[in-house]
Amino acid sequence: MARRRRYEGLNPFVAAGLIKFSEEGELERIKLTPKSAVVISVALIAAILVLNLIHPL
């Protein structure tokens, strides 16, 4: 529970450790919602799987 409270006000990407920023204000430049990030990652994984099926190493 303590971990959840500590990350309560943070962006989900920063809280998950997916994005690290050294300067304040860098986060505002990215206009990506968590829902769109999930959609993009699923599409990327699907594309990689299709490419592996078409042309295996």
From Swiss-Prot:
UniProt keyword Membrane present: yes
Extracellular side: 56-57
UniProt topological domain (Cytoplasmic) ranges: 1-33
Record's bilayer topology term: Single-pass membrane protein
Protein name: Preprotein translocase subunit SecG
Alphabetical keyword list: Cell membrane, Membrane, Protein transport, Translocation, Transmembrane, Transmembrane helix, Transport
Function: Involved in protein export. The function of the beta subunit is unknown, but it may be involved in stabilization of the trimeric complex.
